[in-house]
Amino acid sequence: MIILSKEQVILLHAQLIAETGGSEGVRDEELLESALYAPFQSFGDRDVYPSIQQKAARLGIGLTKNHAFVDGNKRIGAHTMLLYHPLI
């Protein structure tokens, strides 16, 4: 199971901004952490998002909707979601 760290996602975001333009930087670290941890929530003994597809989708949605970055939130959401693609 791939679990991206906050540092890895910040680095990926910086690379995306360098390649595609925009403003670099984290706007809210707590929202970033929330988006990164959401796919791995559980209730009792069950994962809320049990499949890799559901985890990837929840990660992409969280990064897109939380607006943790100054710019490029949709780009980083799509990019991190696609990192799971070879595993699906």
Where do the protein language model's features map onto the residues?
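FIC/Doc superfamily catalytic core
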Residues: 1-88
